Amino acid sequence: MTDLGVVFPAGPDGRRSTAALGRAVVADALRPVDPAGAGAAERETNWRAGYLPHFRRLVEAGIASREAELTIADAGLASLHRRMRVAGPDGAETALGDLVAAPAGRVLGAAEVVGTGEPERELSLPFRGQRLRGDALLRRLDTWVENGIVEPSAAEAVRTVVAHPEWLALPGTTVVVLGAGAEMGPLTALLRWGARVAGIDLPRTQLWERVLDTARRGAGTLLYPVAGEDVGADLITEVPAVADWLTGLPGHLVLGDYVYADGATNVRVSTAVDALTVRLAAARNDVALAFLATPTDVFAVPPDAVAQSV
């Protein structure tokens, strides 16, 4: 693990323990609502294998009320932001919160690719080698609901977009795709619909060749950061530079989080996105947030979904 940029806090022995951080943050999140649960998390001796019951308890404690839910989220985020650190190239460490006002290490310029394709004016979904649209898509949604494949609310959301194809291009909006090269990200679909997208990803040549090729074949506009001949930016080490670049983009901003990395690096980059969000929200009053949920988390299942499944 490279000790540069957003890093885990070091313990008394100098080690940056992911387990110690996870245990402490979950305990801090539970403490205002479920002190007993907080104590159980703190006493967990094998966090790497035993964290699941404590994450389940986070959800259970939040179900009681909206206030409890928000209190847990606020306490957990505050704990994470208070504990995580930022390591500079000189070895000095500062608080994560200092990134809100920290100067950028470099200034990022903006390059642009305008797609050559015709924008799609109708929502379609890939299915068994084809694309479902129109009545065929609506019938398939009904079948999926009847067979318990999707929840009724998910099908209704798709039907709403089908009924409003003018939404697809998101006029007047710039969608920031953090993790532009992510396979599960929306970059390809947005560009196919004719939207304006700002893509952020690591400065890797092959990655950007693929992203730029997608943009050329699409029907939208891709904005991306450059510095000289370098394309892209590393969120873990460049939150101020990326935030300054995003602050100057046109249109209403949707900040979409689709970043992913293996192991501890995923926590570091996700925390960097949090810091970026705080800084950007302080600089602009028109920022909306979007993210991709994970099926590996713990969720409270709504009553209509339970009723539909039995």
What are these regions (language model features)?
Residues 1-61:
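Non-catalytic protein-protein interaction scaffold segments in large eukaryotic complex-forming proteins
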Residues 39-154:
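Low-complexity, highly charged intrinsically disordered N-terminal segments
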Residues 1-2, 208-249:
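Extended charged low-complexity segments that act as oligomerization/scaffolding linkers
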Residues 199-204:
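Conserved acidic E/D residue at the C-terminus of a beta-strand in Rossmann-like folds
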Residues 239-282:
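Active-site/ligand-binding-proximal alpha/beta "capping" segment
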Residues 265-268, 272-310:
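Long, charge-rich C-terminal accessory regions
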Residues 152-171:
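A short, basic/flexible loop-to-alpha-helix module at the beginning of a structural domain
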